[in-house]
Amino acid sequence: MTVCSRRNFVSGMGAVILMTGTSLPAFAKENKADKPKRYAMIHDENACIGCTACMDSCRDVNQVPEGVSRLEILRSEPYGEFPNQEYEFFRQSCQHCTNAPCVAVCPTGASFIDKETGIVDVHKDLCIGCQYCIAVCPYRVRFIHPIHRTADKCNFCRDTNLANGKQPACVEACPTKALTFGDMNDPTSAVSRKVKEKPVYRTKVELGTQPNLYHIPFQHGEPRR
């Protein structure tokens, strides 16, 4: 687990936008069957306890080697005085951007957005390990798999748990239910409802990436700047 200063912790996340939920107008409420799925995730920073069960489960289910990780939980410096201290935990992983720079720069088409789910993924048989996608990703969440020698990252367990009708490994493992996953194009889904009902933010939205990883901000420390 990474420990960093409050200033570095906040500045490293880039600019954020806070949003409050609003109801969709009647004309915008389309039948969910009219659209493909757009999977998204919410990380609740108030519920997360930094136990890293999500990281361990991801590593196990997706056979991620030691030394690399598809997701990280970053921990801030403590707020308050001992013994009444609290920590802020931040999930860092692929944002599954609707406008993904990694897809745009890939010379072989290995980096792609799955049309059925909106998940950003990698065709390992097409990847040549050029690392263009790693260089261009503003979230710094891609890496070269040390065994396959291809680009790798979180893919919401698309080829493991999701393929078997389960939730992503991190969601299933979280003991405090800090993660919510589902289809943003389904207005009845838990993730869609929560984005409308809770104050949420996404990181580096000013870059136009349209990330699909949302965060419910930590309420007990300093306000984000």
UniProtKB/Swiss-Prot annotation:
PROSITE patterns: 4FE4S_FER_1, 4FE4S_FER_2, TAT. It holds the Pfam family Fer4_4. It comes from the Bacteria. One of its GO terms (molecular function) is oxidoreductase activity. [4Fe-4S] cluster 3 binds at residues 94, 97, 102, 137. [4Fe-4S] cluster 2 binds at residues 58, 154, 157, 170. Predicted to be exported by the Tat system. The position of the signal peptide cleavage has not been experimentally proven. Residues 39-67, 85-116, 118-147 form the 4Fe-4S ferredoxin-type domain. [4Fe-4S] cluster 1 binds at residues 48, 51, 54, 174. InterPro entries: 4Fe4S_Fe-S-bd, 4Fe4S_Fe_S_CS, Cyt_c_NO2Rdtase_NrfC, ET_IronSulfur_Cluster-Binding, TAT_signal. [4Fe-4S] cluster 4 binds at residues 106, 127, 130, 133. Residues 1-28 form the signal peptide. The keyword 4Fe-4S applies. The keyword Heme does not apply. Keywords: 4Fe-4S, Electron transport, Iron, Iron-sulfur, Metal-binding, Oxidoreductase, Repeat, Signal, Transport. Probably involved in the transfer of electrons from the quinone pool to the type-c cytochromes. This is Protein NrfC homolog. It comes from Haemophilus influenzae (strain ATCC 51907 / DSM 11121 / KW20 / Rd). The lineage of its organism: Bacteria, Pseudomonadati, Pseudomonadota, Gammaproteobacteria, Pasteurellales.
